[in-house]
Amino acid sequence: MKKKREKLVLKSEIIAQMPKVELHCHLDGSLSLSVIKELAKNAGIHMTMSDEEILEKAQAPENTKNLLEYLQRFDFVLPLLQTYKNLELAAYDVVRQAANDNIKYIEIRFAPSQHLLENLTLEEAVEAVIAGLSRAENDFDIRANALVCGLKQEPIQKLQKLLPLFDKIPDEHLVGFDMAGDELNYPQEKFVDLIHDIKIKGVNVTLHAGECPACEKNILDSIAMGASRIGHGIMTKNLSEAEQKMMIEKQIVLEMAPTSNFQTKAVTELAQYPFKELYDKGIHVTLNTDNRMVSATNLSKEYEKISAWYPDFSLSDFEKINHYAIDGAFIGQEEKEELHQRFTKEYKKISE
């Protein structure tokens, strides 16, 4: 019976049925085609491009040359995300897509500083996103929260302006802080004081780290600074056994995103990709989309990739990584327990 179940997990219809948690999803990289067109219309931008031409600008090629080519895709959508109305709609759209993918809990991250070209304040940008999340929660069977993201290449004075948001917006949907960007030229150690000030406020922290070759020190620095989760963390594979053991003991969660990790050239071949190796060691790995539109993916497709790459990765393994994600989610213990119970029940039903 067990073998039969493990073969079932390879089928896309079984994967579609699985309840899922997603911790690492960027708002601006995850808009649907229909909503990109609606956002353009709202912004008074007359798009003469065909759907194929829009996708060519919004999606990175499967074989992206480098990280820069991948990041250029964000330049296309950012001008559309400069008003309260459009940010609210964008947030709603991403949660709607997630709900259709049977995601029951999602955290969506975005950099408020990227959305101020039409005179929104940082506070208004965050409130717009939260409004979209709340509206989607009312319409779909999903819980959604927001993370504020700082960009490492921005001046520290600008990044410090994000801190008061956690005092001004006491909304339960604003649950954490992240930093993304060029970790090679802006290593984690440059932001020790900033993260210290965030942690003093009692804010949950996840940090992008360990995406580039020889960037594993950023992972250790992130943990030392108080991050309970690491965005991507591919170079965890290069850490010593003692360092990896420390991550297991601290229950540090890795937010991995297979499609994106290959497109950004964090790895270039499957043998280098450490998802299964780290999972087998007991490290708390999770699966995420990173950017639904830019990577032309959804969470079910990421699960299908893992099933294809590691045929022995069973239904119970997928259940386990979702429990890891629940444990790492920036929510209260009571809500975590509810999700744990629900997922245990639903995965049991799928396996029968």
Curated annotation (Swiss-Prot):
Protein residues bound to Zn(2+): 24, 26, 208, 290
Xref: Gene3D superfamilies: Metal-dependent hydrolases
UniProt-listed InterPro entries: A_deaminase (IPR028893), A_deaminase_dom (IPR001365), Ado/ade_deaminase (IPR006330), Metal_Hydrolase (IPR032466)
EC numbers, comma separated: 3.5.4.4
A single cellular component GO annotation: cytosol
SUPFAM superfamilies to which the protein is assigned, alphabetical: Metallo-dependent hydrolases
Matching Pfam families: A_deaminase
One MF annotation (Gene Ontology) recorded for this entry: adenosine deaminase activity
Cofactor(s) needed: Zn(2+)
Binding note for cofactor: Binds 1 zinc ion per subunit.
Residues in the signal sequence: none
Residues that hold substrate according to the record: 26, 28, 181
UniProt-annotated catalytic positions: 211
Family: Belongs to the metallo-dependent hydrolases superfamily. Adenosine and AMP deaminases family. Adenosine deaminase subfamily.
Protein name, as recorded: Adenosine deaminase
Source organism of this protein record: Lactococcus lactis subsp. lactis (strain IL1403) (Streptococcus lactis)
